[in-house]
Amino acid sequence: TGEKPFTCKECGKSFKTKQILCTHELSHTGEKPYVCIECGKGFYQKGHLNVHSLVHSTKKPFICTECGKTFIVKQLLHEHFLIHTGEKPYACPECGKLFRLKQLLTSHLLTHTGLKPYTCPECGKRFAFRGNFYQHLHLHTGDKPFSCTECGNCFATKVQLQRHHLLHTGEKPFVCTECNLSFAGLANLRSHQHLHTGEKPYKCTECGKCFRFKGHLTSHMKIHSGIKAFICTECGKEFTHKYSLRKHQRIHTSEKPYVCTECGKSYKQRRSLNDNLRIHTGEKPFACTECNKTFLSASCLQAHKQTHTGLKPFQCNECGQLFSRKGNSNVHLQSHTGEKPYTCAECGKSFTTKVTLNHHRYTHTGKKPYPCTECGKCFRQKYELRCHQYSHTGENPFECTECGKSFPSRARFNRHRNIH
């Protein structure tokens, strides 16, 4: 009949039988009566324990004919195979959005009801999904129970560990059908695909800025609130987002968890590692629609686009100078504050940027990593090499708007400009 007379008092969800209701209620109490004798993990239902027990068995009889991946149970193979077919059989009755799995649809439906049955006892924040609730609890406890067997790094969730592990394996199973670029995570692929479609469906009600993902919009909204809840215990600097604090703290700890498998160079940010990997592959996937010039990273493309528009949206609050890139604006700001957070371990000299510090280090090592392909002369900085190459090509790209004279380097152009 479809009747569901048994209702959960905690969240209002209804069930056909009292037994199913009792099993569901365990999700609110946290009780897990079915315990695995191999690893001690607990489960709400006996069926879930039975499926879990297969994890300890090395037998994976169900094989994907597309990619060869093996699975413990047939249901997991069926769910996996939908990735290859692109089939999404479960449709949301509210908005028509399609999903591969029934549980993904069930989770999505909560976004329409607004129901958030899971409340954090520490801060009162409410969650629609139990997984998100447990993940949030780790913020208060600091618990990171999932450890990488390769490097020992610990993570709050299993998903974070799995994503991290791909750095070691180099596996990128998600391929863009437009340009054949491959990605380690499905979310990364979806983010990339928006570059092809140009779609940015999430709009900020404060300033009108649009975003590809709801998470990016939520993160952006904190800028308008002005709240900076995350404080560095080393220097007291405040941040709007936790990931910004984490990234900043690596300045103090010198931690560089992202290591290039090609050259061994390590980075503080995953994005920097990805940019470095493209140097090895020669890949430049980001193309300018104006002149077709290609770039290693989206940020380089974005900066280049402003050479066509002349737009300089970042203004210094101290002196009013305008910049086309936020990074350049931040570096310039340090000329007012006097802040120099990057210190040379050899001589103690401090610098405003990491790039400047790295260039300075070459004065101690004598290293000149940038050779000219024409004459073999080597340079400490890529910029110096580029200026030198103009002596071979005869190119003078820096032109004075006052008198029309042109120069091979910005430094010589700036010296000349002072004459006017």
Swiss-Prot record:
Localization = Nucleus
Keyword presence, Plastid:
no
- GO MF: DNA-binding transcription factor activity; DNA-binding transcription repressor activity, RNA polymerase II-specific; RNA polymerase II cis-regulatory region sequence-specific DNA binding; zinc ion binding
Check the record and name the SUPFAM superfamilies matching this protein. Answer: beta-beta-alpha zinc fingers (SSF57667)
Q: Does the keyword Ribonucleoprotein apply?
A: no
A GO biological process held by the record: regulation of immune system process
Residue ranges that the Swiss-Prot or TrEMBL entry lists as coiled coil? none
Q: Which terms in the GO cellular component ontology are assigned?
A: nucleoplasm
Q: What is its main location?
A: nucleus
The protein's UniProt keywords, in alphabetical order, are: DNA-binding, Metal-binding, Nucleus, Repeat, Transcription, Transcription regulation, Zinc, Zinc-finger
- SMART domains given for it? ZnF_C2H2
In the record, the note on similarity to other proteins reads: Belongs to the krueppel C2H2-type zinc-finger protein family.
What this protein is reported to do is described as: May be involved in transcriptional regulation.
Q: What is this protein called?
A: Gastrula zinc finger protein XlCGF58.1
